[in-house]
A protein has these predicted regions:
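Beta-lactamase-like hydrolase cores
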Residues: 26, 31-101, 107-111, 178-184, ...
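Bacterial Sec-dependent N-terminal signal peptides
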Residues: 1-27
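Extracytoplasmic
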Residues: 88-92, 110-112, 118-121, 136-138, ...
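A small/polar active-site loop signature that marks catalytic segments
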Residues: 225-360
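C-terminal soluble interaction/assembly domains
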Residues: 324-438
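Active-site-adjacent, His/Asp/Glu-enriched structural segments that form or flank metal-binding
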Residues: 135-202, 210-217, 224
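Active-site SXXK
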Residues: 103, 117-135, 194, 233-238, ...
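Second-shell loop/turn segments in exported
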Residues: 61-70, 108-117, 160-170, 179, ...
Length: 438
């Protein structure tokens, strides 16, 4: 009687506990369902999920492997168990895993559901940019001058034109190098103004579907330290070097008779690294607009870039009308993709080494760097998973590559919409990655 009372008390405590539980069904249960053995008691692994989990995942238990099942069946058993928890009941979850070695689907769960991707949208942008522009592409900022040659007294009777190419990496070193090039012409006085040519992209300073009260990047073709301060900084640097200007600063389109002074460049891989490793939204938008500009039009727009991406979606065998590409960073509320789309683009990249070799070097590495530095540490996924994270209010996602225990190369996408806490959503993603890695 006393023993029953103790059991009752313990049950009440467990029911009152404010936790979420994910339940794993062991592979032996799958074998029973497949009819390979008599009914047995399934081994159930219970794992408590607290808010904020995912920052340190040393507590993720090892997954059991049933020798009677194939590798693929063991993977299915593990992922089916992970996806039986309460989080899946209260949110929208989509998962797809592709075996790149055998070139076939390994696992799928609501993989065609249209969902907001958050920053895994940057994978779409990166792959499309490398496909359209190539791995040798450079972001360019060109500086021109008008007027005759500098006279014997060091006077330039003309204007300086700064033609922006939406390079987010322009910094103090670039401004100094530009000023040095102007001084090297023998210029001491500029009888003219400094103009910004902003015709690289349209006039939209914010992306379509961005929340006005968020901390959003400013979308301008001429940047300095991520700010719209290029011409101001150049004027200041010229004055510091003893070069005076008689005119002011403004915006004007480059005239046809202007002469090139200097070009500052940054390579696509150089820009893509912070875009992916640190999930920099401005860098992603700059990358996105390069795609549209590559079509040969001035005033590049998000629509032009999306048109190219829609063509790529068609190229990988999917229907563009099933998705909506609104921006390059994933900030827009109007982006809608699916795990299947992200996986098929990752698969396409893997098959094209000119894309993959650059992309794989820019993705965060679990437990090592970027936005995955503090995730999956001490697990089989650490230093193995290379993937892009995604987080906005109510959305958490993860998409990338890993190597399975049998040596197979895999790509995957996990998108969760509707969750109110990041911890449980990230924890589910982490456990899937560990299950695939073990």
């Amino acid at each position: 009687m006393r023993l029953r009372y103790i059991y009752a008390v313990l049950l009440c405590v467990l029911l009152a506990a404010n936790v979420e539980a994910q339940v794993y069904i062991d592979s032996t249960e799958v074998a029973r369902i497949l009819g390979r053995q008599p009914a047995q008691t399934a081994i159930v692994q219970e794992y408590t999920v607290e808010d904020g989990e995912g920052e340190d995942d040393t507590g993720i238990p090892e997954f059991q492997t049933d020798a009677r099942l194939s590798w693929k069946e063991n993977i299915k058993a593990r992922l089916d168990g992970i996806l039986q928890g309460s989080l899946v009941e209260t949110t929208q979850v989509g998962v797809m895993v592709w075996d790149l070695t055998d070139d076939c689907s390994l696992y799928s769960y609501r993989e065609r559901m249209q969902m907001r991707p958050a920053s895994t949208m940057k994978c779409v942008t990166a792959i499309a940019a490398l496909d359209r522009l190539g791995s040798d592409y450079n972001f360019r900022t060109n500086i021109y001058c008008t007027g005759d040659s500098v006279d014997s007294t060091g006077v330039l009777k003309g204007d300086i034109y700064c033609v922006g190419g939406m390079d987010p990496m322009i910094g103090a070193g670039d401004i100094s190098a530009i000023a040095d090039s102007i001084k090297a012409m023998g210029v001491r006085i500029i009888n003219g103004s400094i103009y910004a040519d902003l015709s690289f992209k349209d006039r939209d300073r914010l992306g379509n579907g961005w929340c006005w009260d968020d901390k959003n990047p400013t979308l301008t073709p001429l940047l300095y330290g991520k700010r719209d301060e290029f011409t101001t900084r150049l004027r200041s640097r010229l004055r510091e070097m003893g070069i005076s200007l008689s005119g002011g600063a403004g915006e004007r389109t480059l005239p046809g008779n202007a002469k090139l002074i200097v070009t500052r460049t940054h390579g696509i891989a150089e820009v893509m690294r912070p875009m992916m490793k640190q999930s920099d939204n401005l860098y992603a938008e700059a990358m996105f607009y390069q795609i549209g500009a590559a079509e040969g039009c001035r005033w590049s727009s998000a629509k032009q870039s999306a048109t190219y991406i829609n063509g790529l979606i068609r190229k990988v065998g999917l229907t563009p009308n099933n998705y909506n590409i609104a921006d390059g960073s994933g900030l827009s509320l109007y982006n809608y993709v699916s795990p299947e789309l992200e996986v098929q683009l990752l698969r396409y990249a893997f098959k094209n080494r000119n894309i993959y070799d650059t992309l794989i070097e820019t993705l965060p590495i679990a437990g090592v760097d970027g936005t995955l530095k503090s995730r999956m540490r001490g697990t089989a996924a650490a230093n193995n998973v290379r993937a892009k994270t995604g987080t906005v209010m109510g959305v958490s996602s993860l998409a990338g590559y890993l190597t399975a225990s049998n040596g197979h190369q895999l790509c995957f996408a996990i998108i969760i919409n509707g969750g109110m806490r990041n911890g449980p959503m990230r924890s589910l993603q982490n456990r899937i990655c560990v299950a695939l890695s073990q």
